[in-house]
């Protein structure tokens, strides 16, 4: 805009344009080409060569991946099974600090005698299990062994909008312990529920300790189209003495006779206060939920129950339209109960939640960074099956309290055709670099296919 003043001179004022906007339509996923990251990969390799590369070690970048030859030292935590020795080691890898979407899968090529257990990492210090043939135990035990490992760069999908299944129950049973809910419509499909006379019960399912309450009431008679799902809001925080805990809606369903049936639960990803009992929880609550059309966002994720009870991540807070530097590439999973690694060094944690989508995508389960205390077996989580997490540790008497972050979830193209994971497989990268064991490395996510 030009402003003339007394005809003597002009002052040009550029008012500019708004730099903030609300994105209403879903962003189409377009993975960047390998060439975008080549200089970054070369930089971290050069940095590693100058600072961390051990004597006689080598590192090079070729064919879209990093090949590292380094010394694998057995930390003498050995278990022998089927003519294989399983033990624990620690290595230092090139590290990415700045690029949130870029990850590596670290694993051994099939030409190596050593099998490093595959792991997802950003680089840096990595501690985990490896195996080698029993016949080589004498040679490896004295000095360690030089071995080649691959670092495969990949980019997961951003997590889309997440909803909870809202279905009609064919049969149901109501007991005297159910609280009552009165539904009030606020606007469109946003509802308020006033719940009274809640009766909380302790529930233990596969060692998971939660407190749960049920409620029932009359629906408003509003016809709900089939392609609708629940959007649930953030957990509600409570305190008891010096402890905090959270509760949220677990499920809400309709019944054929126009009733609404639902449940509330304490949050598994929090450490439960030791003195928390049903008597400490509220018997009167006001809840809010929204019914949304899934047609507007066809790439959404539909969970069988509220994911906020088990996971955290910026995408679960997506009701906040403008987040500061959000990370929509991963979700964090927490221990739903205390995990004791004695006398067994293994745990299989099963979480009663499933997901589905309109495509064949899956979630990749991997270990949460933990300074070498434990590792999570990398494997795909396939649709319409409960989440299972295999955790192992060679740290004797290790205890992970409820609420400890144990795993991350990454959203990937389909990696396996069945419900089998990487357990009991030969966990090596094949010659063509298209698989690890029985798990595919999809072209949509892995950058080395661009080389």
Swiss-Prot record:
Domain of life: Viruses
Similarity field: Belongs to the herpesviridae U10 family.
Name under which the protein is recorded: U10 protein
């Amino acid at each position: 805009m030009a402003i003339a003043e007394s005809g003597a001179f002009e002052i040009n004022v550029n008012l500019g344009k708004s730099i903030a906007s609300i994105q209403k339509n879903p962003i189409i996923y377009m993975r960047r080409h390998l060439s975008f990251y080549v200089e970054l990969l070369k930089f971290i390799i050069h940095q590693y060569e100058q600072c961390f590369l051990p004597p006689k070690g080598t590192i090079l970048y070729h064919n879209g991946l990093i090949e590292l030859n380094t010394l694998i030292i057995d930390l003498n935590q050995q278990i022998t099974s089927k003519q294989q020795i399983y033990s624990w080691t620690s290595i230092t890898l090139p590290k990415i600090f700045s690029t949130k979407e870029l990850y590596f899968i670290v694993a051994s090529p099939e030409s190596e005698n050593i099998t490093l257990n595959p792991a997802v990492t950003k680089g840096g210090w990595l501690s985990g299990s490896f195996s080698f043939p029993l016949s080589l135990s004498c040679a490896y035990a004295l000095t360690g062994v030089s071995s080649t490992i691959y670092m495969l760069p990949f980019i997961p999908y951003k997590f889309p909008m997440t909803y909870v299944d809202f279905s009609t129950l064919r049969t149901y049973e109501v007991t005297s312990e159910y609280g009552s809910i009165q539904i009030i419509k606020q606007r469109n499909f946003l509802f308020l529920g006033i719940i009274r006379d809640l009766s909380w019960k302790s529930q233990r399912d596969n060692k998971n300790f939660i407190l749960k309450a049920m409620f029932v009431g009359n629906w408003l008679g509003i016809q709900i189209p089939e392609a609708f799902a629940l959007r649930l809001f953030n957990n509600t925080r409570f305190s008891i003495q010096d402890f905090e805990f959270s509760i949220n809606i677990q499920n809400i369903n309709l019944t054929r006779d126009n009733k609404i049936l639902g449940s509330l639960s304490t949050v598994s990803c929090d450490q439960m206060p030791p003195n928390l009992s049903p008597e400490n929880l509220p018997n009167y609550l006001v809840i809010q939920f929204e019914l949304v059309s899934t047609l507007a966002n066809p790439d959404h994720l539909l969970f069988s129950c509220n994911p906020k009870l088990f996971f955290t991540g910026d995408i679960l807070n997506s009701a906040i339209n403008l987040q500061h530097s959000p990370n929509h590439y991963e979700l964090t999973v927490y221990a739903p109960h205390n995990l004791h690694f004695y006398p067994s060094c293994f745990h299989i944690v099963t979480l009663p939640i499933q997901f589905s989508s309109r495509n064949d995508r899956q979630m990749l389960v991997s270990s949460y960074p933990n300074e070498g205390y434990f590792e999570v077996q990398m494997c795909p989580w396939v649709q319409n099956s409960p989440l299972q997490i295999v955790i192992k540790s060679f740290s004797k008497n290790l205890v992970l309290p409820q609420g400890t972050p144990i795993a991350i979830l990454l959203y990937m193209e389909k990696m396996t055709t069945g419900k089998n994971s990487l357990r009991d497989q030969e966990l090596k990268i094949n010659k063509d670099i298209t698989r690890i064991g029985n798990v595919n490395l999809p072209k949509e996510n892995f950058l080395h296919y661009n080389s």
